UniProtKB/Swiss-Prot annotation:
One of its GO terms (biological process) is sorocarp development. It comes from Dictyostelium discoideum (Social amoeba). Residues 60-72, 89-98 have a biased composition (Gly residues). Coiled coil: none annotated. This is HssA/B-like protein 34. It comes from the Eukaryota. Residues 73-88 have a biased composition (Basic residues). Residues 1-26, 60-98 are annotated as: Disordered.
Length: 98
């Protein structure tokens, strides 16, 4: 139970911190475990997704373009992310490293 509790509280703090670092505009790359690629309209390129590129819990979803650009390599998930770094939902194939 102790381990589960610490994981839960860690997930909660990541979720709450995501909104404070949500949008950096174009040209920003946070590496493979990016937790705030495209939150809000048009940040990081021309995407209009909300929450794309996943976070450390691998559960982010995107509604529309994620992380801008067309034909990138980091946004191939379909709603549930992939493993520890999750890659977000359906975006427009944008790359996290705009």
């Amino acid at each position: 139970m102790t381990l589960f509790s610490s994981i839960s509280s860690m997930s909660s703090s990541m979720t709450s911190s995501r909104s404070s670092i949500a949008s950096f505009g174009s040209g920003t790359s946070m590496g493979s475990n990016s937790i705030a690629c495209s939150v809000g309209s048009g940040s990081c390129g021309s995407g209009s997704g909300s929450g794309g590129c996943g976070d450390l819990t691998g559960g982010a979803k995107s509604s529309g373009g994620s992380c801008g650009g067309k034909g990138g390599s980091h946004n191939h998930g379909h709603g549930h992310g992939h493993g520890p770094h999750g890659h977000g939902g359906k975006g427009s194939g944008g790359s996290c490293s705009c």
